[in-house]
Amino acid sequence: MRMNPTTSGSGVSTLEKKNLGRIVQIIGPVLDVSFPSGKMPNIYNALVVQGRDTVGQAINVTCEVQQLLGNNRVRAVAMSATDGLMRGMEVIDTGAPLSVPVGGATLGRIFNVLGEPVDELGPVDTRTTSPIHRSAPAFIQLDTKLSIFETGIKVVDLLAPYRRGGKIGLFGGAGVGKTVLIMELINNIAKAHGGVSVFGGVGERTREGNDLYMEMKESGVINEENIAESKVALVYGQMNEPPGARMRVGLTALTMAEYFRDVNEQDVLLFIDNIFRFVQAGSEVSALLGRMPSAVGYQPTLSTEMGTLQERITSTKEGSITSIQAVYVPADDLTDPAPATTFAHLDATTVLSRGLAAKGIYPAVDPLDSTSTMLQPRIVGEEHYKIAQRVKQTLQRYKELQDIIAILGLDELSEEDRLTVARARKIERFLSQPFFVAEVFTGSPGKYVGLAETIRGFQLILSGELDGLPEQAFYLVGNIDEATAKAMNLEMESNLKK
């Protein structure tokens, strides 16, 4: 760990001025810089252009070396807009890769790709920094034990459990509850696992980033009174930024998460929204650097770039990084190289359904479309596996019968099918759950449901012990005891009305 060479401070300027170059060409966000013979910077070194533009405005642009061109020239990609840069301007080689602040000082704050705070809450302690380019942990450091990462969310833990140190794809359109689900996971990991979260906003809308920040402050995930008690650090490289920033912002977020895992020995949740934008930015940079495009116009290094990022997300003997990545599927084509490359790395998928959201069932996780490699008897145990399979079979049968019900009505079904439908409707409602972060909007207190409680609840519904209870008793409750208590209250209310 060392001082970030790109941040200004006492004693840094003398270090910076050791190796100077000059801009010889500018094409959009790409700069060609010439250096004296024998003083070429290394690949991935950070270069800083400082000076004034034609109207006297100060310029401070950081770039990253991508190619050594020969003739003492390097090609670098800018991390911010290149407006005002001119040929002949002085370029400082910092002699090291981009480094960003890490540790407790990052919690509750918003950073850009360079690790500079952008929330106007004052400077951040930069005594502890870490370079954004690091190799993945060695095999000997990895924790190979397969273990479930309990989220306290019934539908996730039962039907598509997350792996500790795994990677989860989050699929869902606008307005189906993705943000609320993300905030609930951040809240639950802090309370149940004593962990922290890092949110990487990669190439998404600035408005969404701002909304997320405001909602986090409202729900207490970011503590405004005591910022150090916040549970999340935010790193944004949004749509309006140059491709260099969007390509590297994921690595900045990952570097912050790695420190919490390796040094603080914590369980960390890393959110990347959206992993497709990371690939898209890489494609833009690749074209600007003059590389021959591959299939569908993507960069030839697509698999390598994705692998470099994903392999750093893992469990070690110190702690774990569990990553949840929102995946945009262009034109709903799952065979597109970007989502297809992402799928190769995922351990589980959580699919959010607009149909369930329309019914008011939140979290709107589709129980039949969501999958997990962890749902195997040898990992989750025989009982969990059997109940998960029976829940899926019941819901699948209900789905098959829906056309018949719509045309002929429930009365035309056999006794067995009617029972299946009744249980499926109870299961569907019991998969909903009140969230802690939604208390502000709904007024009902949030519930964390342990895995054992979840299994017991669905076991009771499937066994038929609760067939006599009304289905609305299962809607938006925590464990099964709350459902039976709610049923008694409903019965008392109906008796009073009589």
UniProtKB/Swiss-Prot annotation:
GO terms for molecular function: ATP binding; ATP hydrolysis activity; proton-transporting ATP synthase activity, rotational mechanism. It comes from the Eukaryota. SMART domains: AAA. Its EC number is 7.1.2.2. Pfam families: ATP-synt_ab, ATP-synt_ab_N, ATP-synt_VA_C. SUPFAM superfamilies: C-terminal domain of alpha and beta subunits of F1 ATP synthase (SSF47917), N-terminal domain of alpha and beta subunits of F1 ATP synthase (SSF50615), P-loop containing nucleoside triphosphate hydrolases (SSF52540). It is found in: Plastid, Chloroplast thylakoid membrane. Keywords: ATP synthesis, ATP-binding, CF(1), Chloroplast, Hydrogen ion transport, Ion transport, Membrane, Nucleotide-binding, Plastid, Thylakoid, Translocase, Transport. Its main location: plastid. One of its GO terms (cellular component) is mitochondrion. It catalyses: ATP + H2O + 4 H(+)(in) = ADP + phosphate + 5 H(+)(out). One of its GO terms (biological process) is proton motive force-driven mitochondrial ATP synthesis. InterPro entries: AAA+_ATPase, ATP-synt_VA_C, ATP_synth_F1_bsu, ATPase_a/bsu_AS, ATPase_alpha/beta_chains, ATPase_F1/V1/A1_a/bsu_N, ATPase_F1/V1/A1_a/bsu_N_sf, ATPase_F1/V1/A1_a/bsu_nucl-bd. CDD domains: ATP-synt_F1_beta_C, ATP-synt_F1_beta_N, F1-ATPase_beta_CD. Disulfide bonds: none annotated. ATP binds at residues 172-179. It is a peripheral membrane protein. The keyword Membrane applies. The keyword Phosphoprotein does not apply. Belongs to the ATPase alpha/beta chains family. Produces ATP from ADP in the presence of a proton gradient across the membrane. The catalytic sites are hosted primarily by the beta subunits. F-type ATPases have 2 components, CF(1) - the catalytic core - and CF(0) - the membrane proton channel. CF(1) has five subunits: alpha(3), beta(3), gamma(1), delta(1), epsilon(1). CF(0) has four main subunits: a(1), b(1), b'(1) and c(9-12). PANTHER family: ATP SYNTHASE, ATP SYNTHASE SUBUNIT BETA, MITOCHONDRIAL. NCBIfam families: atpD (TIGR01039). This is ATP synthase subunit beta, chloroplastic. It comes from Jasminum nudiflorum (Winter jasmine). The lineage of its organism: Eukaryota, Viridiplantae, Streptophyta, Embryophyta, Tracheophyta. The gene is atpB.
